[in-house]
A protein has these predicted regions:
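Extended hydrophobic-aromatic, low-complexity segments
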Residues: 258, 270-271, 294-297, 312-314, ...
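Short beta-alpha junctions and helix-cap segments that line functional grooves
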Residues: 246-247, 317, 406
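Conserved SAM/AdoMet-binding glycine-rich loop
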Residues: 73-77, 82, 178-312
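Terminal RNA-binding accessory module
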Residues: 333, 344-433
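Proteins enriched for Cys/Gly/acidic motifs involved in redox and nucleic-acid/cofactor modification
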Residues: 1-194, 217, 279-291, 315, ...
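Glycine-enriched alpha-helix->loop->beta-strand junction motifs that scaffold or abut catalytic
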Residues: 93, 250-257, 323-327
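Short flexible coil/turn linkers enriched for glycine and charged/polar residues
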Residues: 132-135, 145-146, 264, 296, ...
């Protein structure tokens, strides 16, 4: 029996697909060369915003046409969990709609009911995963989220935060290292809060807020993992979780890369989003980091057109982008999601105006990114070679940032020292030292 998995959405979904693939292998399946050659075709969907849902539906319908007549088609992931019964009724082409942790090795002929089940039937986080074909790998250290941001529906179908234990994460990290992985990219919905739910459960407490003090489990986890593998990169850091201790740990790890989930710079808009901080506080934190490590790299993401956003809020965001001089940033227009606070708010921003604001901030950030890449010309960097002729320094996260082009004869998976000789937009060109 052969399987094919088509994955949409964020890196967290890609980790889920890896775990599903590992499970299928233990059940006797082998990966197919294509969807057309598979006996089992799986679409791991995304439901974060409307555009992602549309892409997921288009992919499912495309897979239904591509698969062989005897193959079974399964839809899983966020859309399956969020719209299970509705999705099953709308897509007769699908053999099974399965939520997180649902086993589908023995397919039923009709879709299952999902909404009754609040926790997976098995532990998806700790399933085995197949060998990776790259010298880096995502490691998901927690599922779900305890925060309730006004724009985000993820907690409604991913649930509250459930952190993996240090031992479970270490076991996976060591297995990946044995397979040749040289860089771990830690991911979760709220990475900086990793471990707090386990600590609360151990003490029988209902609430603990990181901002009110106490130790931060992620600090020790990062230290331990950094002793096991050369590069440990942290993604999805909620800004209030970026404590002084965590900053020191990230800098000491040798990967001074800060992926901060800021979303806006206007304090008024951040409070409307049910989020912490302000542009001023974010700039203060960035300045502290740059004072300690001038070559630190910053990435963030921002939402344009959240309900109630004004021209003054847009101006604050533009001023912040100019002052922050981030290396990388992603911008998205607001998507009204069922079940969220923002879905029922007044003063919705017209879509065209939101797009206009997005274009304005994107143009500014593109110029900043290009300038910061130009500044790297002449510097010496240490690259991890991802594929023939393509490497990354600590400044580039796999898949989402630029690359460094090098001599294609350098072996994949090796570290090499280079000098940057040219910049081409987001990408760089280098020669071996």
């Amino acid at each position: 029996m052969r399987y094919w998995i088509e994955t949409l959405g964020c890196p967290k979904n890609h980790v889920d697909s890896d775990k599903l693939a590992g499970l299928l292998v233990t059940q006797g399946y082998q990966v197919a060369e294509s969807a057309e050659e598979a006996d089992l075709v799986v679409a791991n969907t995304c439901a974060f915003i409307e555009a992602a849902r549309e892409e997921s539906i288009e992919t499912v319908l495309e897979l239904a046409e591509r698969k062989s007549s005897g193959a079974r088609l399964v839809v899983t992931g966020c859309m399956a969990e969020r719209y299970g019964d509705e999705l099953a009724a709308a897509l007769p082409e699908v053999d099974l709609v399965a939520g997180f942790g649902e086993s589908f090795s023995e397919l039923a002929t009709t879709p299952v009911t999902l909404r009754r089940r609040s926790t997976p039937a098995f532990d998806l986080l700790n399933l085995p995963r197949p060998a990776t074909s790259t010298p880096w790998a995502y490691v998901k250290i927690a599922e779900g989220c305890d925060r309730r941001c006004g724009f985000c529906a993820i907690p409604s179908f991913r649930g509250d935060q459930r952190s993996r234990s240090t031992e479970e994460i270490l076991t996976e990290a060591r297995a990946l290292a044995m397979g040749g992985v040289k860089e771990l990219v830690l991911i979760a919905q709220d990475l900086a809060s990793w471990g707090h739910d386990r600590r609360r459960a151990g003490r029988g407490e209902a609430v603990e807020v990181l901002d009110e003090g106490g130790t931060q489990p992620l600090i020790e986890l990062t230290r331990v993992l950094s002793q096991e593998i050369e590069r440990v990169r942290l993604l999805y850091l909620y800004p209030s979780g970026l404590t002084s201790g965590l900053i020191e740990t990230i800098l000491a790890s040798g990967v001074p890369y800060f992926d901060l989930s800021l979303q806006h710079a206007s304090r008024r808009m951040l409070r409307a989003m049910r989020r912490w901080g302000s542009g001023e506080r974010f700039l203060e934190r960035i300045a502290v980091i740059r004072a300690a490590e001038p070559d630190a790299t910053f990435r963030s993401s921002f939402i344009l057109g959240y309900p109630g956003e004004t021209e003054d809020d847009q101006r604050e965001l533009l001023e912040f982008i100019e002052a922050a001089q981030l290396d990388w940033a992603g911008f998205f227009t607001f998507s009204s999601e069922e079940g969220t606070l923002a879905n029922g708010l007044d003063h919705q921003v017209p879509a065209e105006l939101a797009l206009e604001r997005l274009r304005e901030v994107s143009e500014l950030q593109d110029a900043i990114t290009a300038r910061r890449r130009d500044e790297m010309v002449g510097t010496r960097q240490r690259l991890l070679i991802d594929s023939p002729g393509v490497g990354r320094s600590v400044r580039e996260c796999p898949e989402i940032d630029g690359i460094v082009m090098v001599e294609p004869s350098v072996a994949v998976g090796e570290f090499v020292d280079v000098t940057i000789v040219a910049s081409h937009g987001t990408d760089l060109e280098a020669v071996l030292v």
